[in-house]
């Protein structure tokens, strides 16, 4: 009878050890319900772009969880606007860039532009400015 208990115990331990997962399925609870924070600041590669020379403006920022984000670029003289949106935990300067185009008319001219990074589900807003030195 004792041998059966030992076998049963060993069998149950093997099942318990065999059924543990090394990786979780789906997103972590931190990324769903955790507090939002920046891991790296919002940075802009070119604060004086000359779009007539095909220069680009690239953006970079990292967060602790995936969020819906939006970069809004607004010309302070013309009122022109460009929006760039995405859902991720990172704005990668290799993927997110601006070449001077617009989302709606009028077009950008040589002017100062206000940049705003906002998040759909968070209260944080990051702001900066750049000056266009050559229009597209």
Regions found by a protein language model. Name each.
Residues 4-11:
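Sec-dependent signal peptide recognition
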